[in-house]
Amino acid sequence: MNNLKNLRGTVDLLPDNLIKWQNVEKIILELLLRASVKEIRTPILEMTELFMRGIGEGTDVVSKEMYTFLDRGERSCTLRPEGTASVARAIIQNGISSKSLQKLWYMGPMFRYERPQAGRQRQFHQLGVEFIGYDSVRSDIEIIALAWDILEKLGIKELNLEINTLGDFNDRSNFQKAFLKWLEVNKNDLDLDSQNRIVKNPLRIFDTKNAKTKSILEDAPKLFDFLSEKSLKRYINIKEMLKLLKIPFIENFNLVRGLDYYTHTAFEITSGALGSQATVCGGGRYDNLINQMGGTETPAIGFAIGLERLILLAGKDLEESRETDIYIVNKGFQAEILAIDLSRKLRNYDLIIELDLSGASFSKQFKKANKLKSKSIIIIGDDEALKNEFKIRLFNNINVENHEANISFEDDIKLEKWLKTNFLLDKNL
């Protein structure tokens, strides 16, 4: 029993750690609500075929990183490695029309068998935002701006936006033919991993971290040179609109998102706050995905943010938790019953209530309230129980007028008046 522990690449998030997580999530969800983006929840477990068709068999995610197994019905199942394919499947399966515009978000655990490191785990958490049915340049800009605003709102420093265009299907097809011809001549100079990608997923060679291969690729054909006039115009419009919105960016023509379903706009947001440029957000347009998976042709664009890395980068102030408003000190059987009943009533207000369940002496309970920096305390002992009342007072601010009061358990009006006065609660309670 003593040897039982979590799997490598998974982490227990304990209450103190979760304070920052919850604060970060709250800020994100408030911003998404204001942007009229609605939540969607899809299963963590999906049929393996979904990701093979949606992400692409030649990707590292599918070929190396997925957690896949046969269930008791001999069906191949996979713990989701990302969220976009599941959203696309849900759109198709639930008969959502291609003409129905959807702004969706999801947040939850994903699974990839990677080498664990700071900000990257095998079970990791991801925020995803998907705009389904939108094909205008404006939607590309809105999705980039939304991702940028989330990161800025969280106080993340040294942000850099990199953009590229992957063109449409024909652009990529024409480029790939030229690139494969170039690879025939230069493949032996590439690193082994890049050579293996030639057959499976040649565009992913541009993702290489190998310095020598990067240098060689500088002489390779550029996808940008194969863009149609329409694709080029779209890309120019995106750059112009980003400039007007004062969102700084740099062009990175080697930026190829790691999944096969991307078209046109591709972008990444990185931060140098951890000492090196770490990718915080990645996204792009995927107009072919839903059609590729058996649905009708539906344009879409989205992004994903890894929460583990986001937590590392987010501001220190987000580690602070809301302090206890009222600590209920109680001692004696009848007092304990009254304290439980009162705590239930107080939870109807926008206050943090801590009910002491220890049965310890009053002095020890006072020390606990002080340690928690509670703004006020309620005292219920045998005397208060006999009088059917409780004492409430500000804990460390006795100079405030009306800082203390004795209130009957039935006198809700007097209780609300004291709470409104000392906690500045909504006067319409």
Curated annotation (Swiss-Prot):
Keywords: Aminoacyl-tRNA synthetase, ATP-binding, Cytoplasm, Ligase, Nucleotide-binding, Protein biosynthesis. Its EC number is 6.1.1.21. PROSITE patterns: AA_TRNA_LIGASE_II. It is an enzyme of class 6 (ligase). Its main location: cytoplasm. Signal peptide: none annotated. InterPro entries: aa-tRNA-synth_II (IPR006195), aa-tRNA-synth_II/BPL/LPL (IPR045864), Anticodon-bd (IPR004154), Anticodon-bd_dom_sf (IPR036621), His-tRNA-ligase (IPR015807), HisRS-like_core (IPR041715), HisRS/HisZ (IPR004516). It catalyses: tRNA(His) + L-histidine + ATP = L-histidyl-tRNA(His) + AMP + diphosphate + H(+). GO terms for biological process: histidyl-tRNA aminoacylation. It holds the Pfam family tRNA-synt_His. CDD domains: HisRS-like_core. It comes from the Bacteria. GO terms for cellular component: cytoplasm. GO terms for molecular function: ATP binding; histidine-tRNA ligase activity. Belongs to the class-II aminoacyl-tRNA synthetase family. HAMAP family: His_tRNA_synth. This is Histidine--tRNA ligase. The gene is hisS.
